[in-house]
Amino acid sequence: MYKEINNIETYFHNFESIESNKKSVLFIAGAGMDHKFVRALNLQDDEFNPPLVIDLPGHGETQDSSKNKIEEYSGFLSEALMDFKISNLTICGYSMGGLIALDLILGKKFPAKSLILLNSIAPMMVSSSLIELANKGNSFAADFIIKYGLSKNLIGIKNTFPSNANQVMLDDLTACRNYQPNKELFSEIGIPVNIILGGKDRLIDPDQAEVFARNLSSKIYKIDNAGHFPFFEDPVDLSNIIKSIT
């Protein structure tokens, strides 16, 4: 379904299928991605609504241009969710989406019963070389992320990233690099926070992840046979973990 948010035609994935008696998980996509990243997930139909996604500005089916600040994305999602009263909601942010989800919760911008950070920690280390590649074009940045993030060969994985000539990847990666959450607010989150990481993800430092988890008083779940793309590398294990913690 589509709605206009701040004069932006916005795509809401599966929102027309929400049943109030079921659990809901709002997924927030990573850099350059859109609602298609959840297509391999399998949550129980009798217990869960289909995966919910709102395409960010300049991503997927949503109009306008991408942003280079996490706070702009979280503010947009806050506005987009304003008209919805979704009970029993978990927010699950993937990579960049994890930073957006964290900012939503820290800013009390939308109520949720729990938070899942998928392949996402803060601060997020984004190298200068990756920024330079993104400045050359979306496909160059995508190649880098796939090279160091993917644990196995998957045909078509690059199709999850934008192939056009805009600067979506540059904006998104800049937003990730510059985002610094207010750690003083961590103790005020007030809901369970769980972190899911791929055991073969070379884009996230495991020691930094441990420090981040301690700061949030959260538990880390690891998918041993996945890298930075568990929703494609091991969607069954990922789906089972999500079901067990929501």
Where are each of the predicted segments found?
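Active-site loop/oxyanion-hole signature of alpha/beta-hydrolase fold enzymes
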Residues: K36-A40, P50-C92, N240
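Conserved HGGG/HGGXW glycine-rich cap/lid loop of the alpha/beta-hydrolase fold
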Residues: I8-Q63
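Conserved alpha/beta-hydrolase "acid-adjacent" motif
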Residues: R202-Q208
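Flexible "cap/lid" loop of the alpha/beta hydrolase fold
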Residues: L99-A142
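Catalytic histidine-centered segment of alpha/beta-hydrolase-like enzymes
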Residues: A226-S239
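Conserved alpha/beta-hydrolase "nucleophile elbow" surrounding the catalytic nucleophile
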Residues: A29-A31, L89, G93-G98, G198
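Conserved alpha/beta-hydrolase catalytic His-Asp/Glu region
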Residues: E132-E188
